[in-house]
Design a protein with these regions (language model features):
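Short acidic, glycine/serine/threonine-rich loops at helix termini
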Residues: 14-17, 52-53, 74-78, 105-108, ...
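N-terminal amphipathic, basic-rich helices that act as targeting or association modules
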Residues: 363-395, 399, 403-405
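Residue-level detector of conserved catalytic or cofactor/ligand-binding positions
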Residues: 436-442
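Iron-sulfur cluster-binding cysteine motifs and their immediate structural context
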Residues: 224-226, 250-269, 298, 303-325, ...
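Mobile "lid/hinge" segments at catalytic clefts and subdomain interfaces of large enzymes
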Residues: 132-136, 140, 403-436
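Intrinsic disorder at enzyme termini
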Residues: 172-229, 233-238
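Active-site cofactor/cluster-binding pocket
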Residues: 1-200, 270, 274-275
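Ferredoxin-type iron-sulfur electron-transfer modules in oxidoreductases and energy-metabolism complexes
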Residues: 114, 127-141, 218-237, 262-295, ...
Length: 445
């Protein structure tokens, strides 16, 4: 017998999904989530510092971590509290680089088959030989119409999940390690971020008291909370080559999450930006343009979809590199690309793709899927009209990514101007927004 419950957040993809699985020889009547597990797997290495994962694992249980780190690198990246729990509770610790295995097989970032095979080898719900046979039969039935090549790639992924597992030697000295697994929010974040967003994102929303929502009884939430989330879930993301870039800004135009942005600076401004903010003379802005140009990526907001690389017409201007290599650039993005004082209003216009991308996006860092095409249009619309927009949102993907409280991607500028977003689930959306439009002159008179 088997039972499955699933726990997940509001994000369309790359959010957290917890699969609570029970297996037994007798009917299972439990009506609650698993809180003490024999086996726990973490499929994204960044979750270790975002969620309380390891404490739900029983002593002598098995822990599987999908990560790009080698065994001798684990102590550099895994918080001391987690390693101490593993050592103190005699946990059987395994690692696998499922992303590397799936990419080598031509499956891109689809590592589910690799990780499923690894689960059956470690959990031993049924003999691993039987599990492998069943999985390969399922592959043939599921992907048979897609051709022999796709079938063979997925069969190879099953074998990779069995063979690529590495058992980690748990060191006794880990029992003496310290270091909090979940990092506290920065000291300068607003109270709503500290008291509401952070607990909800850590799957602790049920612990919040009613008093935490004082002042928001009518359901309104402040704009722009998504900028504080900094999910950091992309394992690989683009790095900009200043010598190859032709400064067309297509990458920024096509980015679904506003995570890559062009910046223009004058000579005086270049003296005050952080070290490492390298620029080149701006192109296409006139012969005597005083500006220098840089395309800046936000490592913690990028989802690694690769749309920017596909859109880029200049070979080599953008290449993919590891998240670890790009982490230091977050400061450059936050202090310069997000700083409205560096916006050049004399350059911004709606006459070309290039120039409109120098405008502030009033829709950023949403919970949309990696590579989403819909948010690209919303972001562009916000760059054109964002400081004076009323938005009535019909139910669907766009409402989930736009109003999934407390993460709101619509934001306001330094003058307090920005889109006003509303969503009414049970009303005709055209009628709903038209009445808002009709009522506005009356409210202002």
């Amino acid at each position: 017998y088997c039972q499955a419950y699933f726990e997940y957040d509001t994000k369309k993809s790359f959010g957290i999904t917890k699969s609570h699985l029970r297996f037994g020889r007798h009917p299972i009547s439990s009506t609650y989530y698993v809180s003490r597990a024999d086996f726990v797997a973490c499929h994204n290495q960044t979750y270790l510092t975002k969620y309380d994962i390891i404490s739900e694992l029983k002593p002598h249980g098995s822990f599987l971590l999908n990560c790009e780190w080698k065994e001798d690198e684990l102590e550099q990246h895994i918080p001391g509290d987690i390693l101490r729990y593993i050592a103190e509770n005699d946990i059987h610790f395994y690692i696998i680089d499922a992303n590397k295995e799936s990419q080598a097989l031509g499956l891109g970032n689809r590592s589910n088959m690799v990780l499923q095979a690894a689960f059956f080898k470690l959990a031993r719900v049924i003999p691993v030989e039987d599990a492998v046979a069943h999985m390969k039969d399922a592959v043939k039935k599921t992907y048979g119409l897609k051709g022999e090549k796709v079938v063979n790639m997925n069969i190879a992924a099953v074998d990779a999940g069995i063979n690529a597992l590495v058992e980690v030697h748990v060191k006794p000295e880990w029992k003496n390690l310290t270091g909090a697994a979940i990092q506290p929010p920065r000291a300068d974040v607003p109270d709503i971020i500290r008291n509401i967003l952070v607990p909800i994102n850590a799957q602790k929303g049920d612990d919040l008291p009613v008093s935490a929502f004082k002042g928001m009884e009518d359901g309104t939430m402040p704009l722009g909370t998504s900028q504080y989330e900094k999910r950091g879930i992309a394992t690989h993301l683009p790095v900009w080559d200043k010598d190859e870039c032709i400064q067309c800004n297509r990458c920024s135009m096509c980015c679904p999450h506003a995570a890559i942005r062009p910046v223009l600076l004058i000579e005086e401004e270049k003296k005050s930006v952080p070290a490492g903010f390298e620029t080149v003379p701006a192109k296409g802005l006139g012969k005597d343009s005083p500006y220098s140009f840089r395309m800046q990526v936000s490592p913690y907001d990028c989802l690694g979809c690769g749309v920017c690389l596909t859109a880029c017409p200049a070979e080599g201007a953008l290449t993919m590199t590891s998240f670890e290599d790009m982490k230091p650039e977050q400061t450059l993005f936050d202090e310069v690309a997000m700083n409205e004082s560096y916006l050049k209003k004399d350059v911004i216009n709606d006459k070309s793709v290039k120039n409109v991308q120098f405008a502030k996006p009033y829709f950023q860092f949403s919970a949309a899927c990696a590579g989403c095409a819909e948010t690209t249009y919303i972001k562009l619309l916000s760059q054109l009209f964002g400081d004076r927009m009323y938005i009535g949102n019909a139910a669907g993907c766009s409402s989930a990514i736009s109003g999934g409280a407390p993460i709101l991607p619509y934001c306001k500028d330094c003058q307090g101007h920005g889109p006003a977003w509303e969503h009414s689930l049970f009303e005709d959306n055209a009628e709903f927004l038209s009445l808002i439009h009709i009522s506005e002159p009356t409210r202002r008179s």
